[in-house]
Amino acid sequence: MHLKPTRFFHANQPPMPHSYEMEDLCFDDMQYRWSPSNTPYRSMSRRYKSVSRSGPSMRVRSRTPCRRQTIRGKLMSKERSVYRHYFNYIARSPPEELATVRGLIVPIIKTTPVTLPFNLGQTVADNCLSLSGMGYHLGLGGYCPTCTASGEPRLCRTDRAALILAYVQQLNNIYEYRVFLASILALSDRANMQAASAEPLLSSVLAQPELFFMYHIMREGGMRDIRVLFYRDGDAGGFMMYVIFPGKSVHLHYRLIDHIQAACRGYKIVAHVWQTTFLLSVCRNPEQQTETVVPSIGTSDVYCKMCDLNFDGELLLEYKRLYALFDDFVPPR
């Protein structure tokens, strides 16, 4: 059987002599390519193809239109326009967005890497924070491996009224806060050359109730091995506090982070690392105002109770070592 080739040329291009080496042949609605065996070969391309020749270039065109791609593109464009209204509505309503995320059976993203220093104010609802030598990650609470293994933390009441009550009644439960007070005692020993005593330092620290709230929430959240350090805040005035974590890894549950941020309004809480030691830096945020409606307590009574406590010598030595370690630490701003 002899096939007569059908070729398409530009209008101003002269006809070329027949050459079947790289020429597409059209037979009915199917496109063929010539071969020595004269067996039709169906081309998979439906686009314009350029044929290289020794003479002027020529373009061979398929006779089958690209209807399937056109229909698929229209369907995808229609689907995008339908879902765009839904996602625009979700973006304007954070509660609806949170409800949608909680409704997912399998989370889309379980962990997100972060860099230190990291401001806890950048977290969103249900974000937990994991710090270790393997990296620093934000996780979706309840789905990260650590949350799954440890479960929900046993948090007592940490609303504003409960925190103020614990702050006022710390005189009756002073032994429970001996780790908090031991840091003030160790700081006064370091400041003896400046004729400072523990009572003025205690009064200055307790004048910022949010520092006590922070320690109380961390302790009630199960982190009873933490240590706290107090340093003068030269920028915002008063004191800033470092929460020092023991061990080489830290996991902050999302509920714990939410309670800390709610209790310490007007303070900036930043996660950082210093010489393989993880910590939280708690300092005043000049851009926000702190809560001022907190009853005052008798500092002298607390100091008398503190003097009656028998502090562990190893605890005081540990605090002296930690203060010497963090003397060169520059707090993040």
Swiss-Prot record:
Subcellular localization, as worded in the UniProt entry: Host nucleus inner membrane
Signal sequence, renumbered to the chain: none
A Pfam match: Herpes_UL31
GO cellular component term of the entry, any: host cell nuclear inner membrane
GO molecular function: zinc ion binding
Transmembrane segments: none
Region (Disordered): 45-64
PTM remark: Phosphorylated at serine residues in the N-terminus. This phosphorylation regulates the localization within the inner nuclear membrane.
CCCH-type zinc finger span: 128-251
Function per UniProt: Plays an essential role in virion nuclear egress, the first step of virion release from infected cell. Within the host nucleus, NEC1 interacts with the newly formed capsid through the vertexes and directs it to the inner nuclear membrane by associating with NEC2. Induces the budding of the capsid at the inner nuclear membrane as well as its envelopment into the perinuclear space.
Quaternary organization: Forms a heterohexameric complex with NEC2. Interacts with capsid vertex specific component 2/CVC2; this interaction directs the capsid to the host inner nuclear membrane to initiate budding.
Family classification: Belongs to the herpesviridae NEC1 protein family.
HAMAP family according to UniProt: HSV_NEC1 (MF_04023)
Name of the protein: Nuclear egress protein 1
Organism annotation: Varicella-zoster virus (strain Dumas)
Gene (name only): NEC1
